[in-house]
């Protein structure tokens, strides 16, 4: 019996003394005991370490160490008594006990593993189902937002938005530029129209003055004469028709013709002016200015004092001549050198005794020359001509076309011609 591998097997308890499964064995007065509806206690491996087993004995790792939840089981006292009834006799019940014990342990191990797997699977299934119910929407939305297709669509949307914004900005800038151009064009046209209106109003005023000055006075006086004629009763016999014809001839002789100023451009002068307008210059050798110098400027600035006249012309060309009234400086403070160049009653250009109300200064010189109203008008007419062509050269005349510029130049030449012929305007 000492070498028997199953020696001492009857001393091993398959359950803990406190296990509900063997309460019927510990308490003989209890006929039937039920376990907890959901907990079954299994023996711990430490309870089996007292009896060593051989190779064909039970393995400690096969025994469960944790409680396994299962459906409630009911054990009869008869089953417990059967297990314990055979235990005292080891000689007769060792083979049957080993076989039955191995069978029960194997089946119990399989059931425990199945129950554990089932419970773990159920727990995992319930947890995953709960998580899916709670976080399902957020997980799906995050996965969709992070997907490459959504990112690609977002990038394309951003690029499309940037393109649309840039296009809208370009269109806005284009509209602003067009509006500015239209505004500038409208302002230019308005200024030109105002200039034309001023010219037309001046022409209308001149025509009215001309018509009123040239209209005969007899038609206006005839109604007055007829009104003053006393009324006579009866009638007078017209002795002959010759008297009626004679009266009509007298009326025709009294009526004066109505005339108006007409103008027509000389083609040669107009072509020369257009050529000069394309490339404006102040050089007197160009055909346009050379003709004006010969016909208007030189005759207008020709005086008895030739040296002073040449100096005046040079100052006019250089735009350094100044004219000022005599009243700005009292006569008693006039220097002797200025008196030698004329005086309040002697013109320095003609040498004639004339009342001089103005004086000229050439450049920065302190010497003043007294001039008569006639000489002053001739000098100012030339200065006006040079001032206008300088404006054209500098591009300051923008409200007039070529025709208007040409007639303005002709008007200035007309003033120079009248001045050299002796016509001038004096300030009262």
Swiss-Prot record:
GO molecular function, one term: guanyl-nucleotide exchange factor activity
Top-rank taxon, per record: Eukaryota
Localization (cell): Cytoplasm; Nucleus; Cytoplasm, Cytoskeleton; Cell projection, Lamellipodium
Coiled coil: 149-212
Gene Ontology BP annotations: protein transport
Keyword Membrane: no
Keywords: Cell projection, Coiled coil, Cytoplasm, Cytoskeleton, Guanine-nucleotide releasing factor, Nucleus, Phosphoprotein, Protein transport, Transport
Sites bearing Phosphoserine, chain numbering: 147, 149, 215, 218, 240, 248
GO CC annotation terms, alphabetical: centrosome; cytoplasm; cytosol; lamellipodium; nucleus; vesicle
InterPro entries: RAB3IL/RAB3IP/Sec2
Gene3D superfamilies membership: 1.20.5.4880
PANTHER family in the record: RAB-3A-INTERACTING PROTEIN, RABIN3-RELATED
Entry's family note: Belongs to the SEC2 family.
Protein's job: Guanine nucleotide exchange factor (GEF) which may activate RAB8A and RAB8B. Promotes the exchange of GDP to GTP, converting inactive GDP-bound Rab proteins into their active GTP-bound form. Mediates the release of GDP from RAB8A and RAB8B but not from RAB3A or RAB5. Modulates actin organization and promotes polarized transport of RAB8A-specific vesicles to the cell surface. Together with RAB11A, RAB8A, the exocyst complex, PARD3, PRKCI, ANXA2, CDC42 and DNMBP promotes transcytosis of PODXL to the apical membrane initiation sites (AMIS), apical surface formation and lumenogenesis.
Quaternary structure note: Homodimer. Interacts with the N-terminal region of SSX2. Interacts with the GDP-bound forms of RAB8A and RAB8B. The interaction with RAB8A is prevented by phosphorylation of RAB8A at 'Thr-72'. Interacts with the GDP-bound forms of RAB3A and RAB3D. Interacts with DCDC1. Interacts (via the N-terminal region) with TRAPPC14; this interaction mediates RAB3IP association with the TRAPP II complex. Forms a heterotetramer with RAB11A where RAB3IP homodimer binds two RAB11A subunits.
Name of protein: Rab-3A-interacting protein
Biological source species: Mus musculus
Source lineage: Eukaryota, Metazoa, Chordata, Craniata, Vertebrata
């Amino acid at each position: 019996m000492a070498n028997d591998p199953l020696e001492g097997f009857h001393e091993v308890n398959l359950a803990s003394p406190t296990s509900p499964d063997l309460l019927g064995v510990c308490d003989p007065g209890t006929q039937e005991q039920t376990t907890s509806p959901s907990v079954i206690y299994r023996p711990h491996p430490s309870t089996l370490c007292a009896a060593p087993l051989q190779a064909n004995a039970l393995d400690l790792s096969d025994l469960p160490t944790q409680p396994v939840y299962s459906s409630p089981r009911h054990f009869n006292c008869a089953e417990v008594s059967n297990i314990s009834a055979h235990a005292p006799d080891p000689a007769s019940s060792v083979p049957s006990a080993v076989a039955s014990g191995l069978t029960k342990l194997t089946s119990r191990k399989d059931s425990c593993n199945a129950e554990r797997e089932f419970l773990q699977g159920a727990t995992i299934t319930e947890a995953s189902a709960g998580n899916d119910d709670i976080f399902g929407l957020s997980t799906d939305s995050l996965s969709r937002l992070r997907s490459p297709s959504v990112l690609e669509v977002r990038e394309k949307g951003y690029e499309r938005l940037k393109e649309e914004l840039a296009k809208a900005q370009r269109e806005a800038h284009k509209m602003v530029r067009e509006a500015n151009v239209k505004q500038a064009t409208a302002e230019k046209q308005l200024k030109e129209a105002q200039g034309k209106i001023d010219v037309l109003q001046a022409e209308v005023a001149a025509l009215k003055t001309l018509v009123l000055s040239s209209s005969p006075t007899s038609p206006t006086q005839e109604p007055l004469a007829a009104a003053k004629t006393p009324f006579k009763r009866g009638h007078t016999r017209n002795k002959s028709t010759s008297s009626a014809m004679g009266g009509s001839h007298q009326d025709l002789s009294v009526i004066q013709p109505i005339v108006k100023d007409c103008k027509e451009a000389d083609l040669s002068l107009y072509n020369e002016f257009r050529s000069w307008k394309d490339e404006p210059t102040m050089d007197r050798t160009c055909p346009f200015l050379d003709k004006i110098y010969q016909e208007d400027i030189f005759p207008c600035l020709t005086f008895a004092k030739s040296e002073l006249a040449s100096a005046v012309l040079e100052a006019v060309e250089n735009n350094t001549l100044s004219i000022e009234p005599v009243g700005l400086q009292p006569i008693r403070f006039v220097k002797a050198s200025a008196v030698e160049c004329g005086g309040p009653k002697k013109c320095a250009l003609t040498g004639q005794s004339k009342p001089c109300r103005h004086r000229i200064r050439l450049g920065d010189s302190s010497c003043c020359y007294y001039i008569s109203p006639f000489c002053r008008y001739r000098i100012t007419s030339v200065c006006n001509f040079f001032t206008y062509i300088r404006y054209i050269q500098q591009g300051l005349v923008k409200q007039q076309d070529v025709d208007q510029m040409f007639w303005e130049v002709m008007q200035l030449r007309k003033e120079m011609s009248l001045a050299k012929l002796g016509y001038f305007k004096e300030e009262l």
